């Protein structure tokens, strides 16, 4: 039963970590290298992440700089950024690609908060699905007479505690991201 609980906790941790990654891709008013991590460049016929083709830096809170190692990749990187759904406009000076982050409008901020809430809801659903799987495993153990009914109840209580903790953690991550998005 301990292995089920450990496995459950590990899977729930991964669900919240995935939420964190999704939030990293959400654009706030602040520049972040994680914004361009999800952008793939068609480099010699292979979709390649920007951070594998160039050094990505944030010199100030409103600018991202991208310096491709291969001079031939400048146009490809620029094209990939423009085609992404992030609404970013790259400026290529031949040596470096700069992306200036325009301030977000109030309307756009509210849209981003809605998206963040959707991501959080998806993470909570994932956590609850993991709970269901764990409870099914525990019930199966009881049915196979590997554990007693009391142990089954105790195990299900532990799984519920884990679920509550990770749902609360998701809410905390959302509150932090919401504050960051609404910050002017």
Curated annotation (Swiss-Prot):
One of its GO terms (biological process) is cytoplasmic translational termination. One of its GO terms (cellular component) is cytosol. The keyword Protein biosynthesis applies. Signal peptide: none annotated. SUPFAM superfamilies: Ribosome recycling factor, RRF. It is found in: Cytoplasm. Its main location: cytoplasm. Keywords: Cytoplasm, Protein biosynthesis. One of its GO terms (molecular function) is ribosomal large subunit binding. Responsible for the release of ribosomes from messenger RNA at the termination of protein biosynthesis. May increase the efficiency of translation by recycling ribosomes from one round of translation to another. Belongs to the RRF family. This is Ribosome-recycling factor. It comes from Oleidesulfovibrio alaskensis (strain ATCC BAA-1058 / DSM 17464 / G20) (Desulfovibrio alaskensis). The gene is frr.
């Amino acid at each position: 039963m301990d292995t089920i609980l450990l496995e459950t906790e590990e899977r729930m941790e991964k669900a919240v970590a995935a939420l964190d990654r999704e939030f990293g891709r959400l654009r706030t008013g602040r520049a972040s290298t994680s914004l361009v991590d999800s952008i793939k460049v068609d480099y010699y016929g292979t979709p390649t992440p920007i951070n594998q083709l160039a050094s990505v830096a944030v010199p100030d809170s409103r600018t991202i700089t991208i310096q491709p190692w291969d001079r031939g990749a400048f146009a490809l990187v620029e094209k990939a950024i423009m085609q992404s759904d992030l609404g970013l406009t790259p400026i290529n000076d031949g040596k470096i690609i700069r992306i200036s982050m325009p301030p977000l409008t109030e309307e756009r901020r509210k849209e981003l908060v809605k998206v963040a809430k959707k991501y959080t809801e998806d993470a909570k659903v994932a956590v609850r699905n993991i709970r269901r799987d764990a409870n099914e495993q525990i019930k199966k153990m009881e049915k196979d007479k590997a554990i007693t009914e009391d142990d089954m109840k105790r195990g299900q209580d532990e799984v519920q505690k884990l679920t509550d903790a990770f749902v609360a953690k998701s809410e905390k991550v959302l509150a932090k991201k919401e504050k960051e998005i609404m910050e002017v």
